[in-house]
Design a protein with these regions (language model features):
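Canonical positions in the second alpha-helix
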Residues: 1, 76, 112, 164-165, ...
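Short coil turns that delineate tetratricopeptide repeat
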Residues: 5-7, 81-82, 117, 169-170, ...
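Alpha-solenoid helical repeat scaffolds
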Residues: 10-14, 85-92, 121-127, 140-141, ...
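Short coil/linker segments at helix-helix boundaries
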Residues: 18-75, 79, 96-142, 148, ...
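Residue at a conserved register position within TPR or TPR-like alpha-solenoid repeats
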Residues: 19, 94, 146, 183, ...
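Hydrophobic/aromatic packing residues within the alpha-helices of TPR/SEL1-like helical repeat arrays
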Residues: 66, 73, 109, 158-162, ...
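Single-residue signature of alpha-solenoid repeat helices
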Residues: 69, 105, 155-158, 192, ...
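Alpha-helical adaptor scaffolds
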Residues: 128-190, 194, 198
Length: 237
């Protein structure tokens, strides 16, 4: 197949899938938290002291085979640079491999965002032309992925990509809400409120901002602010 047409998209996708699948083996590991990489535990048992021990299933990669998968992805991208599905294929491979520390994934998505900003022609996804807002919507999904992984490094990636995207898509409140949620997780409620209020100034009916602002106000034990956001919630329900 490769000899007949070395640029064939299905062949290149098949090569990536072969190496990426072959690189992975499944293991069960114990972790102290009730979530790991955004997953619920596969099994919960008690230790000798009666404490819960949580077991999770995750994939371990063979570095050499994983490297072959990335080379296959790069070749697919080189021959089909307009195909977003190949770009996302590589980003997803980085996320799966890096787990709690998605540094390469973040850097790759930053470069893709920058490239998207310079493009004058439409992307494709598979054999179809991608909608104009496809990248914007997909990036919010990656924000959610970084958030869900739940490590300090992934949450920092969540903040950084959300900040970048909020500057590129100023009319989209989701990315500013993301930044507020980062600070809410850090228990910096004052800073979180700053971002939620920034959203509400432009989008007064945004329920995500209202609900999270109310949560921040409750943590601050600020009754006046609680009443303010409760009134906004009642108005928009």
């Amino acid at each position: 197949w490769a000899k007949a047409d070395s640029t064939n998209a299905k062949m290149l996708l098949g090569r990536f899938s072969y190496y990426f699948t072959k690189a992975q083996t499944t293991e069960v590991v114990s972790k102290p938290g009730k979530k790991y990489l955004g997953m619920e535990p596969l099994l919960t048992l008690k230790d000798s002291l009666g404490n819960d021990v949580y077991y999770y299933q995750h994939n371990v990669f063979d570095d050499e085979l994983y490297g072959q998968a990335i080379k296959a992805a790069d070749k697919a991208i080189a021959h089909h640079p307009d195909r977003l599905d190949f770009r996302f294929m590589k980003a997803n491979a980085y996320i799966a491999y890096e787990k709690e520390s998605p540094d390469m994934a973040l850097a790759y998505l930053f470069s893709l965002i920058d490239e998207d900003g310079k493009r004058s022609q439409a992307w494709s996804y598979g054999d179809e032309e991608a909608e104009p807002d496809f990248v914007e919507d997909a990036m919010q999904e990656y924000c959610y992925s970084f958030y869900s992984i739940g490590s300090d490094t992934s949450r920092e990636a969540f903040r950084r990509i959300s900040e970048k995207l909020s500057g590129i898509y100023p009319s989209n409140p989701e990315f500013v809400n993301n930044i507020g949620s980062y600070y809410l997780l850090k228990h910096d409620y004052k800073t979180a409120l700053k971002y939620y209020n920034k959203v509400l100034k432009k989008h007064p009916g945004d329920m995500t901002a209202i609900q999270n602002a109310l949560l921040a106000a409750k943590h601050m034990k600020n009754a006046k602010l609680e009443k303010k956001y409760q009134a906004m919630m009642a108005k928009n329900n």
